[in-house]
């Protein structure tokens, strides 16, 4: 009898696939019964040590979507094949069930979850005695345990974790309520644990049957771990809003997540070694230890204890495995006595700060004057105060011009800023109105009417000569030129029969001197153009090149202007030295 049994399970000599006589007899039995579904299941679960053929699996997947195909009959036939004594038949039957649950109609999973039949393969041992049958029995038991846990998960949750939505927006576990989430995650953990128990080596994956089941398990693990990660993120987001019991369960869940993370990484390394594309393998990074410390500290705070100080104060958000960064760190609990001591210290520091501020204000004699200084309207009569240094420059007393000092009027600064033009009443330099134009000095009139050459400072403000921040540069240059020309003797041939009215604002008693009448046809500029030489620019030492050389007569005038500016600077330095020696003007 045993000899006949062995003969039935021996490969047939004239077949290339290694089918046995038992496989042919089973297929013939279903053919005589007219069951194409049974015949296909038998062909998909033969004793050949190779994965089920794709054409048989596709036919079974198509049958699950047909309304006239009995799902219970298909499931019962597959469960019947799992009771075969040959490990290859049992293993291939489990692969077929797993493949239909993943890619077939959901009615198949619903029937397996609703019926009470189980695989009952916890003590399976190969009875045929083929090559490696005893060693492969261990893989059969582990694989059957995972399939049974997958069916049990569907029975408890009414959905398959491998088919639910995942992600931040509409993920099932990402948007689940706290109570239901804490009850669902342990079920998912049990399924992941059953999957991770299926541990194989690289050499064992050379077997076609084992390799086929490993690929299906790898795809399930990627989907299950994605759901698991969404659930952990949801737990961490709601952790600080949970009560004490929920926080304790959530902390245990997170600790188990860290433990399973290492096992998942080991499983993925095996998958990478057998040639699975690295693009399908996720990158797993462990969360920092400070995250676990923060969760434990919050739980201790809820339980009324004192949390230990954290070992790491700052945690980068990109280091979280779950991709979630906390915006608030839980603070350790403080006793009433310690809190009162902190309050007293803060009050003492505040009192010391106020005393120090009062002492600084009392020691500064100018604090009240500066704080109370405000622009007041000008009065007709102001009392000079020799000790008031802040108001001495606000309303200067009018000084009588010294006739012997040609630079006396330069010491009085203008009350207008450099970048704002003065009013019309002070359009003339230093308040002196220009004299009427003389027929003997047409160049002098043109000099006053020439458009001013404005030079902008790098910061956008109008530049001014050094020592005269409020004086217009063109006005100063014209005055210096007039002064230097009027101090020279009148050469022969000049018309000295002019009016007795003086055009020199620097000396009221000096006789008026006519300007040199240069030929206007040679140097006269067209209307609206810039002059060839501007005394204002010559006063600053800048060179003008408008395409024509400067005449010798005007070069002499430039030298005179430079000499006058040097004398003016020397007089100003003397006045500054005298003022520093006597600060009160006595």
UniProtKB/Swiss-Prot annotation:
UniProt keywords, alphabetically: Coated pit, Cytoplasmic vesicle, Endocytosis, Golgi apparatus, Membrane
GO cellular component, one term: synaptic vesicle
Matching InterPro entries: ANTH_dom (IPR011417), ANTH_dom_sf (IPR014712), AP180-like (IPR045192), ENTH (IPR013809), ENTH_VHS (IPR008942)
Molecular function GO labels: 1-phosphatidylinositol binding; clathrin binding; clathrin heavy chain binding; phosphatidylinositol-4,5-bisphosphate binding; SNARE binding
Cellular location(s): Membrane, Clathrin-coated pit; Golgi apparatus; Cytoplasmic vesicle, Clathrin-coated vesicle
Any Pfam family: ANTH
Keyword Nucleotidyltransferase carried by entry: no
Similarity section: Belongs to the PICALM/SNAP91 family.
Role of this protein: Assembly protein recruiting clathrin and adaptor protein complex 2 (AP2) to cell membranes at sites of coated-pit formation and clathrin-vesicle assembly. May be required to determine the amount of membrane to be recycled, possibly by regulating the size of the clathrin cage. Involved in AP2-dependent clathrin-mediated endocytosis at the neuromuscular junction. Required for the efficient targeting of the synaptic vesicle protein synaptobrevin.
PANTHER family per record: CLATHRIN ASSEMBLY PROTEIN (PTHR22951), PHOSPHATIDYLINOSITOL-BINDING CLATHRIN ASSEMBLY PROTEIN LAP (PTHR22951:SF5)
Protein name in the entry: Phosphatidylinositol-binding clathrin assembly protein unc-11
Source organism of the structure: Caenorhabditis elegans
